[in-house]
Amino acid sequence: MRLRICFLMMFSAQVGAFDAGDMSKLNTGRECARCDLSQADLSDAALSGVDLKWASLTRTNLSGADLRGADLKWANLSGADLTHADLTGATLNGAHLWEARFLGARMRRVSLVGTDLKWANLAGEGFQGADLTLVNLSGADLRKTDLRSALLTKAKLVGANLQAANLAKANLTFANLSEANARKANFAGADLTSADLKWTNLGQANLSGARLTGADLSYTSLFKANLNGAEWARARFCKTTMPDGVINNAGCH
């Protein structure tokens, strides 16, 4: 990594992208809060446990980088390339991730509290056990994404594509999944207490053992969904398509 960074320090004088002093700081230690590393090539870099709070990493190449346990709170990663990076246990609370690429990245137990991931393409990615509290995933592509045991309390997933996603035992209390497409998704044992599921497609979804207490299922499709052992006390049903195709209007006013 040192040879790569030395080359980049010489190149930076020509392009004026990142700060050479900040690059040197990153090379000599694990603390680089508020550093400007914009457009730097840090592919395959060993950055586990590094402190990059508030750092500028716009359009930075972090593909294949080892960022396990890294502190990236409030960092600007807009347009950054994180393909195949290892972010296991990393903290990205409040980070700016507009147009960041995560293809093949390892995201287990990552913390993304309050981040904005609208329209992000995260299809097939692994977020098992991740903290996604208050995250905005509206319109995001989450097809076949692994969200088992993820914490999605008050998360915004309006219009998200969750087809065949795995949300088994995920915590989705007070989450907004209105208009989401969750056809064939796995919500087994998930907690959807007080979740907004209006106009959501849950056709053929697995909701066995799920908690739907107080959830709003108005205009929702549950056609051929598995509701074995699910709890739905105080849930609202209005023009809801039940698993057998019958329309439930019990909660219409």
Stretch-by-stretch model annotation:
Residues 18-253:
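Tandem repeat scaffolds
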Residues 1, 17-18:
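Absolute protein N-terminus
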Residues 8-9, 106:
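Residue-level detector of intrinsically disordered terminal segments
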Residues 12-14:
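N-terminal signal peptide c-region/cleavage motif recognized by signal peptidases
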Residues 1-8:
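Sec-dependent signal peptide recognition
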